[in-house]
Each structure stands twice: as C-alpha cells, then as structure tokens.
Amino acid sequence: AMLHNVVILKDESAAPMIIQLAEGNGGEPYADGRILAMTPLADKQEETFIEFTAPSKPGRYLYVCTYIAHAGSMRGYMIVE
C-alpha cells in the first residue's frame, strides 16, 4: 500500500532529523515536541482528520509526508499571517 501522512513542524530546522527517524520507523514519526500536528499514516482508501490550533507567531511552517522517500517532494508550507 502507498501510505501518506501530513506532519507540520514548529521549526523547519528539525525536518532532517524527524524525517530520518520516521523513515527508520516505517514512515511513522515519533512523538516529538518539534511537531506541531500530524496525521497518522493512511492509504488511498482512508481519510484522516486532525484539529489543532495554529501558532500565533506569523511565519511559514513546513509540512511533509514522512513515509519512506516521500519527504523530498511531498512538502509545502502552512502560512500563518
């Protein structure tokens, strides 16, 4: 199955370590204080939902898919104004 998730980071500089650890764990990220919010891994037949409070600090918050080899291209930014 082709799995995907969305992991929103508080600090983009944490991305390499969080991605590396997740890829070593089958794509599932470990609980980490540097993660703002995340969905569980899901396949194309599933829907997942999360609810969270966006940071009050304006900025760009990186989101990535942490499934194996996906983070390089499956990424973007949540913009807080």
Name the predicted role of every residue range.
Residues N5-L9:
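Beta-strand signatures of extracellular beta-sandwich domains
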Residues L21-G27, I35-L36:
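Solvent-exposed serine/threonine-rich low-complexity stretches and specific carbohydrate-binding patches
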Residues D11-A22:
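Short aromatic-acidic-glycine turn motif
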Residues A1, D32-E81:
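Extracellular/periplasmic metallocenter environments
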